[in-house]
């Protein structure tokens, strides 16, 4: 990303553009700024300033760790909201998260899942709603599983009544 592109983009734009972060969806600024959504997160005022201001130069020594964790935890909350579920639904329908490697699942689209809601315990996996198994993603991602949490697939299918898990489909 050139520095001219960075002048008009935020840390969030820069972060989402990093290879391996394609499972994440954009959390809107109004959601990030809402203090209710920040409850329980440490250093939110300092980190909020960094992630919302324009990035001038990606080589200027950004504090990548804290911002990544903070954005990841806000992301985990956002994808459980109505707007977040809609954003993840679009990605799911496009197959952005990949497909199940199990041959009997017939290339079923998958969802990201964390094995723990605790930061640093494991990287993101993909979850097949047909066979209910978790797999390592084929993509080159090292995202923390807490950015999605262990309950995201269940919440996704329970909150989107028009989209049921293929396991519930009487044709399968």
UniProtKB/Swiss-Prot annotation:
Under InterPro entries, the record lists: Casein_kin_II_reg-sub_N (IPR016149), Casein_kinase_II_beta-like (IPR035991), Casein_kinase_II_reg-sub (IPR000704)
One Pfam entry for this protein is: CK_II_beta
Q: Entry's SMART domains?
A: CK_II_beta (SM01085)
Listed under GO cellular component are:
cytoplasm; nucleus; protein kinase CK2 complex
Q: Which interval of the chain is the signal sequence? A: none
This entry's comment on induction and repression of expression is: In wild-type flies, it is strongly down-regulated by double-stranded RNA (dsRNA) interference mediated by Su(Ste) transcripts. In males lacking the Y chromosome, the absence of Su(Ste) locus, relieves such down-regulation, explaining why it is strongly expressed.
Cited SUPFAM superfamilies: Casein kinase II beta subunit
Q: In which tissues is it expressed?
A: Probably not expressed in wild-type flies. In males lacking the Y chromosome, it is testis-specific and constitutes the main component of star-shaped crystals.
A molecular function GO annotation: protein kinase regulator activity
The subunit structure is:
Interacts in vitro with the casein kinase 2 alpha subunit (CkII-alpha). The relevance of such interaction is however unclear in vivo.
**What does the miscellaneous comment read?**
There are multiple copies of the stellate gene in fruit fly, encoding proteins that are extremely similar, which makes their individual characterization difficult. Thus, most experiments probably do not discriminate between the different members.
What does this gene product do? Unknown. In males lacking the Y chromosome, its strong overexpression leads to the appearance of proteinaceous star-shaped crystals in the primary spermatocytes causing meiotic drive, possibly by interfering with normal casein kinase 2 activity.
What protein family does this chain belong to?
Belongs to the casein kinase 2 subunit beta family.
**PANTHER family linked to this entry:** CASEIN KINASE II SUBUNIT BETA
What protein name applies here? Answer: Stellate protein CG33239/CG33241
Name of the gene:
Ste:CG33239
């Amino acid at each position: 990303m050139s520095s001219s592109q960075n002048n008009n983009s935020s840390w969030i734009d820069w972060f989402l553009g990093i290879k391996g972060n394609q499972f994440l969806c954009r959390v809107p600024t109004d959601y990030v700024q809402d203090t209710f959504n920040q409850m329980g997160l440490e250093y939110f005022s300092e980190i909020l300033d960094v992630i919302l201001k324009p990035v001038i130069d990606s080589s200027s020594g950004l504090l990548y760790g804290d911002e990544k964790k903070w954005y990841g935890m806000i992301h985990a909350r956002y994808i459980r909201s109505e707007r977040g579920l809609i954003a993840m639904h679009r990605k799911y329908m496009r197959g952005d998260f990949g497909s199940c490697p199990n041959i009997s699942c017939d290339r079923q689209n998958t969802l990201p899942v964390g094995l723990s809601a605790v930061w640093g315990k494991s990287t993101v996996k993909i979850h097949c709603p047909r066979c209910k198994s978790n797999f390592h993603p084929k993509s080159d991602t090292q995202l923390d599983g807490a950015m999605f949490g262990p309950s995201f697939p269940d919440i996704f299918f329970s909150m989107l009544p028009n989209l049921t898990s293929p396991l519930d489909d009487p044709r399968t």
